[in-house]
Amino acid sequence: MLQRHSLKLGKFSIRTLATGAPLDASKLKITRNPNPSKPRPNEELVFGQTFTDHMLTIPWSAKEGWGTPHIKPYGNLSLDPSACVFHYAFELFEGLKAYRTPQNTITMFRPDKNMARMNKSAARICLPTFESEELIKLTGKLIEQDKHLVPQGNGYSLYIRPTMIGTSKGLGVGTPSEALLYVITSPVGPYYKTGFKAVRLEATDYATRAWPGGVGDKKLGANYAPCILPQLQAAKRGYQQNLWLFGPEKNITEVGTMNVFFVFLNKVTGKKELVTAPLDGTILEGVTRDSVLTLARDKLDPQEWDINERYYTITEVATRAKQGELLEAFGSGTAAVVSPIKEIGWNNEDIHVPLLPGEQCGALTKQVAQWIADIQYGRVNYGNWSKTVADLN
């Protein structure tokens, strides 16, 4: 059987050929952990440090296609030292969350967007694509096994990390003939335990996160390691993250590992503008980014707001700040949802970003965070953004 998937990747497209059996959730095998753990107190949950009792693994080979999905006790992987993931970075991942709702159910937030992006990442580095809905079903079954470990309370959730790695043996560089797709989950607490905490950024042009024709719009592990050193260098100068600039124009692209938004005031028209960089192949197609844009276009008054995806520069930000036209700025991502910004270091000066009096965020930042949280925790229904995967009743 030959499974064909045609995926658009930036300015070009790849038709992937996933030979053999398709991914099939009905073939799931479950081996339960004989030593189930008890939920940890919420105050002990640190991002990505606590894991649930089970994991999902699905092998793939070019000859056989997708193998039997297996939910089994969380544990180590056994790989050959020559596996291509170790030598040539055949690796990609996703990040999404599941939430307890007032109806005592557990829902995943927009999993279809994550699966679509994961398939794009896989196709770009010649790893196998898969049937998105089947992986969503399997992830739901994994969550159901450990539903007692999904934390309760505003700001608490279950972080889900689907990962795919090339496992082919040998040191030759080429298309992997074997791969492993696995999913692990981690109970997590609020990114900001005591409410918002605005961050200081260093505008960075000496290092480049992504470039045209590259893979900056894909969620590959290889995109992240090179960004740590510039972050450490910024930290020595008192900044928490890098504001990534690109090109001679110093276009603003992303912040740290997040998409970034700015709010400007047009003093001539009196309208406010929410702006973020366009998806030109250098920007990660963030699910939270898309959620912010969709909600802003749906809920903000178009007579008072313009919502734009356009190029803008650090010079524009600095100039408009001096003119009193910079109103607020924030990053967006799965971990924090929104992360308010208070200062940006550039040319040996700090650009000050306004915050609400006595608070650590701007007005729109606060509103966006509430909109998204209400949907994630089941207080508000919005489209098909929440998918129920377990019932606790």
Curated annotation (Swiss-Prot):
<dbReference type="Pfam" id="PF01063">
    <property type="entry name" value="Aminotran_4"/>
</dbReference>
<keyword id="KW-0496">Mitochondrion</keyword>
<comment type="pathway">
    <text>Amino-acid biosynthesis; L-leucine biosynthesis; L-leucine from 3-methyl-2-oxobutanoate: step 4/4.</text>
</comment>
<comment type="similarity">
    <text>Belongs to the class-IV pyridoxal-phosphate-dependent aminotransferase family.</text>
</comment>
<feature type="modified residue" description="Phosphothreonine">
    <location>
        <position position="315"/>
    </location>
</feature>
<keyword id="KW-0663">Pyridoxal phosphate</keyword>
<dbReference type="InterPro" id="IPR036038">
    <property type="entry name" value="Aminotransferase-like"/>
</dbReference>
<feature type="transit peptide" description="Mitochondrion">
    <location>
        <begin position="1"/>
        <end position="16"/>
    </location>
</feature>
<dbReference type="GO" id="GO:0010326">
    <property type="term" value="F:methionine-oxo-acid transaminase activity"/>
</dbReference>
<dbReference type="InterPro" id="IPR043132">
    <property type="entry name" value="BCAT-like_C"/>
</dbReference>
<feature type="modified residue" description="N6-(pyridoxal phosphate)lysine">
    <location>
        <position position="219"/>
    </location>
</feature>
<keyword id="KW-0100">Branched-chain amino acid biosynthesis</keyword>
<dbReference type="GO" id="GO:0005759">
    <property type="term" value="C:mitochondrial matrix"/>
</dbReference>
<dbReference type="InterPro" id="IPR018300">
    <property type="entry name" value="Aminotrans_IV_CS"/>
</dbReference>
<dbReference type="InterPro" id="IPR001544">
    <property type="entry name" value="Aminotrans_IV"/>
</dbReference>
<dbReference type="GO" id="GO:0052654">
    <property type="term" value="F:L-leucine-2-oxoglutarate transaminase activity"/>
</dbReference>
<dbReference type="GO" id="GO:0009098">
    <property type="term" value="P:L-leucine biosynthetic process"/>
</dbReference>
<dbReference type="GO" id="GO:0004084">
    <property type="term" value="F:branched-chain-amino-acid transaminase activity"/>
</dbReference>
<keyword id="KW-0032">Aminotransferase</keyword>
<keyword id="KW-0597">Phosphoprotein</keyword>
<keyword id="KW-0808">Transferase</keyword>
<dbReference type="GO" id="GO:0009083">
    <property type="term" value="P:branched-chain amino acid catabolic process"/>
</dbReference>
<dbReference type="InterPro" id="IPR005786">
    <property type="entry name" value="B_amino_transII"/>
</dbReference>
<dbReference type="GO" id="GO:0009082">
    <property type="term" value="P:branched-chain amino acid biosynthetic process"/>
</dbReference>
<dbReference type="InterPro" id="IPR033939">
    <property type="entry name" value="BCAT_family"/>
</dbReference>
<dbReference type="GO" id="GO:0019509">
    <property type="term" value="P:L-methionine salvage from methylthioadenosine"/>
</dbReference>
<keyword id="KW-0809">Transit peptide</keyword>
<dbReference type="GO" id="GO:0005739">
    <property type="term" value="C:mitochondrion"/>
</dbReference>
<comment type="pathway">
    <text>Amino-acid biosynthesis; L-isoleucine biosynthesis; L-isoleucine from 2-oxobutanoate: step 4/4.</text>
</comment>
<comment type="function">
    <text>Mitochondrial isozyme of branched-chain-amino-acid aminotransferase, involved in the biosynthesis of the branched chain amino acids (BCAAs) leucine, isoleucine, and valine. Catalyzes the formation of methionine from 2-keto-4-methylthiobutyrate (KMTB) in the methionine salvage pathway primarily using BCAAs (leucine, isoleucine, and valine) as the amino donors. Appears to be involved in the regulation of the cell cycle, although this may be indirect via metabolic changes. Connects BCAAs and TCA-cycle metabolism governing TCA-cycle flux to activate TORC1 signaling.</text>
</comment>
<dbReference type="GO" id="GO:0052655">
    <property type="term" value="F:L-valine-2-oxoglutarate transaminase activity"/>
</dbReference>
<dbReference type="GO" id="GO:0009099">
    <property type="term" value="P:L-valine biosynthetic process"/>
</dbReference>
<protein>
    <recommendedName>
        <fullName>Branched-chain-amino-acid aminotransferase, mitochondrial</fullName>
        <ecNumber>2.6.1.42</ecNumber>
    </recommendedName>
</protein>
<dbReference type="InterPro" id="IPR043131">
    <property type="entry name" value="BCAT-like_N"/>
</dbReference>
<dbReference type="GO" id="GO:0009097">
    <property type="term" value="P:isoleucine biosynthetic process"/>
</dbReference>
<dbReference type="GO" id="GO:0052656">
    <property type="term" value="F:L-isoleucine-2-oxoglutarate transaminase activity"/>
</dbReference>
<keyword id="KW-0028">Amino-acid biosynthesis</keyword>
